[in-house]
Regions:
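Helix-loop-beta segment of a Rossmann-like dinucleotide-binding subdomain
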Residues: 86-96, 108, 121, 126-161, ...
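Glycine-rich FAD pyrophosphate-binding loop
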Residues: 24-47
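Flavin-dependent oxidoreductases
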Residues: 18, 174-283
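Helical element adjacent to the flavin cofactor pocket in flavoenzyme catalytic cores
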Residues: 140-196, 204, 382-393
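Beta1/beta-strand and adjacent pyrophosphate-binding region of the FAD-binding site
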Residues: 2-15, 33
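C-terminal catalytic lobe of FAD-dependent flavoproteins
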Residues: 250, 300-399
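Dinucleotide-binding Rossmann-like beta1-alpha1 core, especially the glycine-rich loop
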Residues: 51-126, 136, 252-254, 262, ...
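Short beta-strand to alpha-helix junction loop
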Residues: 60-71, 95-104, 140-159, 166, ...
């Protein structure tokens, strides 16, 4: 079976679906086919995160993350409101619990202001007015942070895009001929031909790029983020975060009250034994071998061994995880933490061991690859989708 289309999108996470949605809005009548190997949308990063609409306070001014998160947060709130999707603008606290964190907290204040985000500085006596159980030396309150149900957002994007979305359609082969577009053969033998290929494959994006004949110059290293549900959700009003270490693109163990009223605690960040390794027993030798064969992984491991061991300790020891939480909320007990589903973050790592700290979008002949889109990509998905669509339309216009 062979099908013809204008654009083939691989991946029905929130970025792939936002791209299909943006294409349909920017060029009505365009033919878009989305290929997704799972049986539904948003099965991996999109559907397995904290559900936070990030304000953009963390990100380097001028970066894609800063620009797209600040813009995307407001757009996501509007999108949810227009489509009746559960959401709430809750604000959040970022709490410094040690003196060594105070300079980093002040730097966040400056960064937030540079990004145009309203930030309020709080002393220790002011913290309980926002979160009665939180304790710290100082904190900042970011009023524009919110929460939503990204799985529902993805489903609405899928419906609104009018794209031909095919679930259970895993790309097996990709061929490309100069001036003649691309052809994707799925593992069931179907061939889909298009003029442009868009790679939004998330945890598999580097593999899809190589399948298309492009060198991504990075590898995805999967980091599992483990969560607990708080048995006493009344301890938390909204969102409580630690001060992150700027060396790492992870925000630390935090507490998030979701749209369902439950409070998620986490995530940590531990190396996963598979691209879709949502627990310790899940190990895929091919995935693990690919990680270990990448020189960048070993550079990264040597550089940050101490941090990595600490994360492993919090993964294997519930008591250690609880201690991390109690730095923010001393009232939390170990038996308050109930295991919840984990997520896996697709983190791009360069050959020299650099953790890619911004969104990464690259182009090849007839291809557009989204190669690094971890948090805050869900928040920023509408602007990311427009940017990818802009590049796709540029390729189509050039013929």
């Amino acid at each position: 079976m062979r099908d013809e289309t204008d654009v083939v999108v691989i991946g029905a996470g929130i970025v792939g679906l936002s791209t299909a949605y943006a294409l349909s809005r920017q060029r009505p009548g365009i033919r878009v086919t989305v290929l997704e190997k799972e049986q539904g949308p948003a099965r991996h990063q999109t559907g397995r995160n904290s559900g936070v609409i990030h304000s953009g306070v963390y990100y380097r001014p001028g970066s894609l993350k800063a620009r797209y998160a600040t813009r995307g947060a407001a757009e996501m709130v509007r999108f949810c409101a227009e489509h009746g999707i559960p959401h709430q603008v809750t604000g959040k606290l970022i709490v410094a619990t040690g003196r060594e964190e105070l300079p980093r907290l002040h730097a966040l204040v400056q960064r937030g202001r540079e990004n145009g985000i309203p930030v309020r500085e709080l002393g220790p006596s002011q913290i309980p007015a926002y979160e009665p159980e939180a304790r710290g030396l100082a904190a900042i309150h970011v009023a524009t942070t919110g929460i939503c149900d990204y799985g529902t957002v993805a489903r609405v994007l899928a419906e609104s895009s009018k794209a031909d979305i095919r679930y259970g359609a895993e790309a097996g082969l990709i061929s490309r001929r100069l001036g003649r577009g691309v052809a994707v053969r799925t593992k069931d033998g179907t061939v889909v031909r298009g003029r442009v290929l868009v790679n939004c494959a998330g945890l598999q994006c580097d593999r899809v790029a190589r399948l298309a004949g492009d060198d991504p110059k990075m590898r995805i290293v999967p980091f599992r983020g483990e969560y607990y549900e708080l048995a006493r959700p009344e301890l938390v009003r909204g969102l409580v975060y630690p001060v992150p270490d700027p060396v790492f693109p992870f925000l630390g163990v935090h507490l998030t009250r979701g749209v369902d009223g439950g409070v998620h605690v986490g995530p940590n960040a531990v190396l996963a034994g598979a691209r879709e390794g949502y627990s310790w027993p899940v190990v895929r030798p091919a995935d693990l071998a690919g990680t270990l064969a990448w020189p960048g992984f070993w550079h990264l491991a040597r550089r940050h061994a101490g941090y990595g061991l600490g994360e492993v300790g919090r993964s294997l020891s519930k008591a250690a995880f609880t201690r991390a939480v109690r730095r923010l909320l001393p009232a939390v007990r170990e038996d308050d933490l109930v295991p919840a589903p984990a997520g896996v973050r697709a983190q791009a790592v360069l050959r020299d061991g650099t953790l890619v700290d911004d969104f990464l979008i690259r182009q090849g002949p007839g291809t557009v690859h989204v190669l690094n889109a971890p948090s805050p990509a869900a928040t920023a998905s509408l602007p990311i989708g427009r940017e990818v669509a802009r590049r796709v339309l540029g390729v189509l216009e050039r013929g």
